């Protein structure tokens, strides 16, 4: 199983992986993802780390708490899916760029 592995380069590989991971984390903070629900009545934005950075709610929803909650949940779930997909893509790029995959 480990016959062809050069363990002397393992430390170097791990150092490169950590450096690349740090770069990707900084890139993620700069990225912004947005999702809308209710035909644009609710818009939620998150950065690449998955932190919600903005929420916009149309004034017409302020009197309808239940609809607002449903639309907020939908928009938050959608934007989190975008962030998660981006994280998977970045992880794949990290490993493929190092020749691990």
From Swiss-Prot:
The record's section on SUPFAM superfamilies has:
YbaB-like
GO cellular component terms?
Answer: bacterial nucleoid; cytosol
Q: What's the short name of a Pfam family annotated to this entry?
A: YbaB_DNA_bd
Enumerate the UniProt keywords alphabetically. Cytoplasm, DNA-binding
- Cell location: Cytoplasm, Nucleoid
Query: Is Transcription regulation included in the keywords of this UniProt record?
Result: no
- Molecular-function GO terms, alphabetical: DNA binding
- Coiled coil where? none
Which InterPro entries does the entry link to? YbaB-like_sf, YbaB/EbfC
Q: What does this protein do?
A: Binds to DNA and alters its conformation. May be involved in regulation of gene expression, nucleoid organization and DNA protection.
Q: What does the similarity note say?
A: Belongs to the YbaB/EbfC family.
Assembly mode:
Homodimer.
The UniProt entry, under NCBIfam families, shows:
DNA_YbaB_EbfC
**Protein name in the entry:** Nucleoid-associated protein Cla_0113
Q: Which organism is it from?
A: Campylobacter lari (strain RM2100 / D67 / ATCC BAA-1060)
């Amino acid at each position: 199983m480990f016959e062809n592995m050069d363990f002397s380069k393992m430390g170097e590989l791990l150092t490169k992986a950590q450096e690349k991971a740090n770069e990707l984390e900084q890139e993620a903070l700069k990225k912004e993802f947005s999702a809308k629900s209710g035909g644009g009545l609710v818009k939620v934005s998150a950065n690449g780390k998955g932190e919600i950075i903005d929420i916009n709610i149309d004034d017409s929803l302020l009197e309808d708490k239940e609809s607002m909650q449903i639309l907020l949940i939908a928009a938050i779930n959608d934007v989190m899916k975008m962030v998660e997909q981006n994280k998977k893509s970045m992880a794949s790029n990290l490993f493929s760029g190092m020749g691990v995959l």
